Amino acid sequence: MFKKFSDNIYIQPADGYTDRPNVGYIKGEKYALLFESGNSQANANLLRDDLEKQGLKQPDIVAIFHWHWDHSFGLHAWNVPTIAGRKTNEKLREVRLWEWDDASMAKRVETKEDIVFCNEMIKREYPDRSQIKVVPADIEFTDTIKIDLGA
């Protein structure tokens, strides 16, 4: 469940079992922004359900902080505009081409493209790794972006 931080800011704490990230929710007068997409379709579904249970509107926009799997692998699950920085999107375009079989994952650890911890958590979050879907964000920015959610 999301914890109320202020009248307009809510935080869902991380879940270390499968490395689900802290997720922020900002409620503007007109729009709501979810900060971090979750690490899977299942994580995104849980976030959606928790927002509904708490009477919070579904996000109009989803933004991610960086490309790491726990922050970005749920991006495809949101049917709203998504936002990421240029370097993050470049990396997501690269990662979406990765294979997720054991050998490919082990090879990325050897080449230091990834780490054992992430592989273990990905395998735990995705019993069926064919379900991994990596996408870049719809909106890409360089340096800064201003989003008016309505006061």
How would you describe each model-predicted region?
Residues 2-52:
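Conserved beta-strand hairpin/beta-sheet module of binuclear metal-dependent hydrolase folds
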Residues 89-92:
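Short gly/pro/ser/thr-enriched loop/turn and capping motifs at secondary-structure boundaries
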Residues 9-11, 62, 82, 138-140:
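Conserved beta-strand scaffold positions in the cores of enzyme catalytic domains, especially
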Residues 13-15, 86, 142:
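Residues at the C-termini of beta-strands that transition into short coil/loop
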